[in-house]
C-alpha cells in the first residue's frame, strides 16, 4: 500500500509540474471485447489519469455493440472520452511530437508491405508519427511467419513478459527494440470488497446453490466451486481440465465446476462436446460406475456476474497450453481467488506457489498438422498434477484462501493501472528525450 501511495504522489506531481511533451495515439481494438481490448483500455485510462495527452483510436478488430452495451455506464462514458481525445488547446497539442502505439496482432499494422487484412492505419498515414511503438504478444514457442519483419519495422516493441522477450528475440526481432511492459488489471473493479456489496453476488450465489450437488436445500457451506474462463479452442486446455475433473471427483464430492466460455472459430454446441468427452472418459469400467461430478456451462454474462463468479469460486482453473499474458488469471487473483494455471508462457510473470497453484506440464508438443501454426509447440498440461492441485484446494481451504489473499496483494502492488502507468510514463519520457523535444514545447498548465 505504501508503494502505491508513493506512486500516486509521484503521478500527481508529474501531472502538475512535468507534463509530457508528447501526444499519444493508442491504436487498439477498443470496442471489440477480448484481451487486447481490455488491456489497451486499462493502459489508456491510466495514462489519461496521469495527465498524458492520449487519444484512443479503434484499430485491429471490428466493433462489437454487444461488448459496448455490456459495459457499466461509467466505463462507457470513460471509453467515449478516450475516443474523443482530450479537450483544451488542441492546436497547441498538435504541435507536440506524436507517438503512435499499435496495439494489436501485427498483421493489422500498416508496415512491411501493408496490413494482411483491412484495418485502420497504424502507424498513421503520411509519417505523422515521430515514433511508433508496437504492443503485442503470442502464445507458442515461436513467432508466426512474417511477424519479425513487421516488428522490426517499428521503433520499439512492448511485450508483456520476459518469457515473451526471449521468444521474440529468438524469432528474429532486434533485441534492442524489445521492452517488457506488463499488463494492468483493474484492481478497483476486481476487488472482493466491491463485489461483496454488489447485488449480482447474491444472485450468483443463489444460482450456484441450485446447481450444486446436493441440491440447495441440502447444500453445505463447504461446496468447492471451481471456475474456468476461456474461449472454446484447443489452446485453452478444456479437455485437460475435464479429464482431471472427472478422474478426481464424482457426484459424491461436494464440488461444482463452472465453465464460462464463448465460441472462437468453433462450434457453439459446447454441451455436445462435453458430453462426448465424458462418454469417452467414463464409458468403460472403473469410474463408469460412478456418477460424474457436475459441470455447468455459462456464456455471455455481464461484467458484474463475472466479478461475482470470481468471488464465489474457491479457485479459478486454467490448464491452458499457452498464454500471451492471462487476463482471467489476473482478474481472479485481483479478486483474491487463487489460480491453478500451467506454469509456462505468460503466467510465469505473476504466478507462484506463494500466490497460487502453478501446474506442471509434460513437455512441449507440436500443434496439430491442420492447425494454422503447425510446427509450433506449446505446453501439455499434466492431468495427474491437475488432479492433485484440485484436490489440494478442496482439502485445504484455508491454504487456498491464504494464497488468494497474497494474489490480491501482488496484483495491487505490481499490476494496478497506476503502477503500470508509471512504467509506461518512464518509457514515454525516454522516447521524449530521444526525440530532443525542447522544453518550451511543454505547455504550462
Each model region followed by its residue ranges:
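Nucleotide-activated donor-binding/catalytic signature segment of Leloir-type glycosyltransferases, i.e.
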Residues: 268-304
